[in-house]
Amino acid sequence: LRKACDQVLKIKGFDTSLGIPHFAGISLNQIPGDPDSVKGSKVRGVYWTRPDSTGKEVIRDSKINESLYSEFVQEFKDTYFHYVYKELSKIFKLGRVRLLLKEPRSTLSWHRDPEPRLHIPIYTNPGAIMVVDSIAKHLPADGSVWITNNTKYHNAFNGGEEDRIHLVACVLDYKFN
């Protein structure tokens, strides 16, 4: 996984123009024939947050039809991620599949997403923590696949001094009990 990540980063660096400090992404799949589907806010995606003391929930960004993301990006087809994508697609109905970077000593907002997420940690450190519904967990980079209920309020923060990079996929058919 690390070798594949390094290959992708040599082909295309992280898109840091997503409007969220210390966060970046690279899309591994796209809407067939639509290279614009992997740019800008489409890498980030829609989410809901409660940004201030009123506690009022607001939506950020435009909704994305995740089910349209079914074509692996051509320039990454020679990486191990193409194999991983094909294997995961046999088990799950996937939406966008991305490499997501959380830079050292940084955090996201407390937010929720429209669907669960599949995480495969690639680069991490003990200070990189995922918090879902007030439960904190470090996801080690040991090859495991984690399904997180991102429809609940959650956060990812990197309290370490090294980058945190996960392969993250939107899972469209997964139901939590």
Residue ranges and their predicted role:
Residues 121-141:
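A short beta-strand-loop-beta hairpin characteristic of the jelly-roll/cupin
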Residues 83-104:
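A short glycine-rich, His/Asp/Glu-containing loop-to-beta-strand
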Residues 108-111, 128-130, 139, 148-160:
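Short beta-strand His + acidic residue motifs that chelate non-heme Fe in jelly-roll/DSBH
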Residues 95, 114-116, 163:
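Residues that flank catalytic or metal-binding motifs in active/ligand-binding sites
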Residues 97-99, 126, 151, 163-165, ...:
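Long, contiguous binding/interaction regions
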Residues 101, 112-128:
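Short, conserved beta-strand element in jelly-roll/cupin
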